[in-house]
Structures are given as C-alpha cells and as structure tokens.
Amino acid sequence: MYSLDWPRAYGIPNSIATFKSLPEDFQVNELFEGQFSGEGEHIVLKIEKRGLTTEEVVKSLARLINKPVKLISHAGLKDKQALTTQWLSVHAPGEIIDGIETLEAPGWRILECTRHNKKLKPGFLSGNHFIITLRNVSDESDLIHRIEQIKFKGVPNYFGEQRFGRDGGNLIKAEEILVQGRKVKDRFLKGMYFSAARSWLYNLILSRRVKESSWNLPLLGDVIQLVGSNSIFVNDKSMDEQLLQRIGEKDVSPASPLPGRSKNLVKGTALQIINDVYEEWSAWLDGLEKNGLEEAWRANILYAEQIEYRINQGTVELSFVLPAGAYATVVLRELVQY
C-alpha cells in the first residue's frame, strides 16, 4: 500500500554497490554549534554506539545509573546498523553520579562527559557528519559523475524510509488513528505516527514535483525557504530570474508542506499541485488538524556539504555533512543502487 520507492532526480544510477555490510560502513557523528555551559542540572554524555538503536542505549544507561528513562534526553535518533556518536543528557540537578564518565556496556561506551543548563532535544543539532563506505562498486565513473552533480544541484529532500518504520508500519498505525479513530495513550508513539503521516504526505508532493522536474524551480505561489533557516516567503511570480539565481547559489529553496492547520500561504501553480496530491488523503488531513498539528515547511532541495570521496579497488569512502533532520540515504539513492 505504501511504496517508498520515490522517483529520483537524476534517474536510476548505473552503479551498484554493497552498503552496510558492517556497522562501520555507516558512521554518523552529531554536530552542534556553540559549547556546553559546563554547569547546570543536566549531565551531558557523548556516546559511541555500534549495532544498537538510540532507545536501546538509553535503556541500558538508565539501568546502569538507576534512573528512569524519562530523565534521559537526546537530540535525535541514530541508526542501529551503524557506528555513531551522539549526545545524551541526564537530568540530575545537584547530583554527582560516580564513575558515569567511564561507563560502558556491550555495544556502547561514553567518550566525553560535562554538564549543561538545558536538556537536549530535537533542534539542538546543527547537522550530522557522515562517513559511508560503499563496497563492490560496479561503475566508479558513474558514481563520480553523480557526486559532482549533486555537489552543485543537491537532491530531493525526501524523508528516508526509516521515518516510516519497518515495512511502513508507522503509516499503518497513523491510518488506524487518523481514519479509524484508534486511541493511543503513549504520547511518544502517537507523535511518531503523526510525524510519519506528515512526512509521507510531504514526500508525495515532492515526488510529484520530481516527476514534473519542478522540485528545484520556483513555481508561481511557491513557499520559498532560506537555506539553513525556517524563514519563508511566497513567490508571486511565475518564474523569477532572481530567485533562480539564488537557488543556484544555494541561498534559497522551494519548500513543500508538512500538513496541519493551514495558514493558506501557498498559492497558484504550487497550490494546485498540493491540492491534487491531497485529494485522496482528506481523512488524514482532517485527523492531523483535529489533533492540533500546525502546518510547517521543509525545503525541497537538500545540499550535501563538504563532500569528499576516496576510491580504492572497488571500494568508495564518502564523507559529507547534512543539516539536522536530513537523511543520508536520500543522497545515496541518487548515487548508487544498493
């Protein structure tokens, strides 16, 4: 029912590669701007994990320090089949937890420990640094050509398939809540299902624009977002040369909605595309509004910055930085089949 094979901006890659044969083939390191305060109610821990989900590490840490899971916070979830570093915070006002800075358990260990005056939460990160190893690459020249292409043009900013759960399971749960009226008491799970539903509808709109080759063009009535910012404005021209130049300079991007209570910003051609996509999803839209979700906007274009690569006998190591909330897999799918 829920196909996650979204159209690609640059066609199906010629090159085929093996990805994630080892957790070390997918390395992710959190990036943030600024410094921790060094004091405050929250102990902040830099964790390295391998072959575990973020939730599994949080539960393991909670057991070792004898704290409820609800006192441990993070800025984002990290993949299980990967080697990742991320920050966790423990609410422990005025408390010293002996030996916490050297704690470790199978699959994870603590690298750094300090304090901060705020707990970690989504929005704290500026981005993530990825180091990806592709093995048995069948067509290195096609891969290199595509890397050079996306350096300047970016890729469609889809939500990755992990957003939707195994086999789209989060979307099935969202359908049960939004359409069938099922009650879910767990606020975290409910929020996760709603996020999946909104991400799905965003991807549908973006995929329509990829098919029509307009995902990176400013249509009449488009909401335009400043790159690296939540600031938006509406394009009131059919094809603005100045906007095209700013898009080429990676300054702005057309944006598509994460549905909720609408402020009716989008107009014209862009609105027509959105309405066409939404037509068969009215029950989901009504349900999201009734549950108090507010419309938000997400850039259509994702730029992978600081791209570097090394090639060694059929193995390619890629390194790049993405903003928080972006998915490395949507970059990879434009480069190789895996």
UniProtKB/Swiss-Prot annotation:
Class of this enzyme: isomerase
Enzyme active site: D79 (nucleophile)
Gene3D superfamilies assigned: TruD, catalytic domain, TruD, insertion domain
Keyword field contains Isomerase: yes
GO cellular component, one term: cytosol
Family matches, as InterPro entries: PsdUridine_synth_cat_dom_sf, PsdUridine_synth_TruD, PsdUridine_synth_TruD_CS, PsdUridine_synth_TruD_insert, TruD_catalytic, TruD_insert_sf, TruD_pseudoU_synthase
Signal sequence segment: none
GO BP terms, alphabetized: tRNA pseudouridine synthesis
Any GO MF annotation of the entry: RNA binding
Entries under Pfam families matching the protein: TruD (PF01142)
Keywords: Isomerase, tRNA processing
EC number of this enzyme: 5.4.99.27
Function text: Responsible for synthesis of pseudouridine from uracil-13 in transfer RNAs.
Family of the protein in this entry: Belongs to the pseudouridine synthase TruD family.
Protein's name in the database: tRNA pseudouridine synthase D
Lineage: Bacteria, Pseudomonadati, Pseudomonadota, Gammaproteobacteria, Legionellales
